[in-house]
Amino acid sequence: MAANKNKNQSSLVLHKVIMVGSGGVGKSALTLQFMYDEFVEDYEPTKADSYRKKVVLDGEEVQIDILDTAGQEDYAAIRDNYFRSGEGFLLVFSITEHESFTATAEFREQILRVKAEEDKIPLLIVGNKSDLEDRRQVPMDEARGKAEEWGVQYVETSAKTRANVDKVFFDLMREIRTKKMSENKDKNGKKSGKSKKGFKQRCCLL
């Protein structure tokens, strides 16, 4: 029975999501809220924690693999390896800390550098701690302007109230899925082109 269960899980499509952002912005809190419906306020700084969950995305059962990375500068070197394995990124900052918003540009540059060979990288900007509106330091218009400049979606979340938590993970998975479908289509197109070319050559030889 267990073997069948593992077999079924391994056959599911897997979407790999990387949590990126400065320390203390709530990356771990968002991840744990999505995974377990729990709000964890006091959390030890993360080096890298990995989570996997089976979800239903637009009627299809899939698996999401979430890697929660460290925001501290000490871990900048090892982040490259994590970024290489990722298929999509949630770039998180706290609306109560403008410095964390400014830092998103540097994190994005690191992602683009590591993923230089890829055309469009699935990425969302996430303004967390929307429940602390009275302490807001990042105007919504400023964050939206940055998202528009980068050609990505901007969503505000609260790991505490669970506002938009599911939305950011599911929206990112949809972007990852679209990219995979596009890449598969391109690959199949190239294979088809090669087959036709080979067929023509054989015809000429005959």
From Swiss-Prot:
Function: Multifunctional GTPase involved in a variety of cellular processes including gene expression, cell migration, cell proliferation, oncogenic transformation and membrane trafficking. Accomplishes its multiple functions by interacting with distinct downstream effectors. Acts as a GTP sensor for GTP-dependent exocytosis of dense core vesicles. Required both to stabilize the assembly of the exocyst complex and to localize functional exocyst complexes to the leading edge of migrating cells. Required for suppression of apoptosis.
Cross-referenced SUPFAM superfamilies: P-loop containing nucleoside triphosphate hydrolases
Family of this protein: Belongs to the small GTPase superfamily. Ras family.
Keywords, ordered alphabetically: Cell membrane, GTP-binding, Hydrolase, Lipoprotein, Membrane, Methylation, Nucleotide-binding, Prenylation
UniProt note on tissues of expression: Weakly expressed in adult tissues and highest levels were found in heart, brain and testes.
Ranges of Basic and acidic residues composition bias in the record: 180-189
Cell location: Cell membrane; Midbody
GO molecular function (one): GTP binding
Binding-site positions, GTP: 21-28, 68-72, 128-131
Name of this protein: Ras-related protein ralB-A
E.C. code: 3.6.5.2
Membrane protein topology class: Lipid-anchor
Transmembrane segments: none
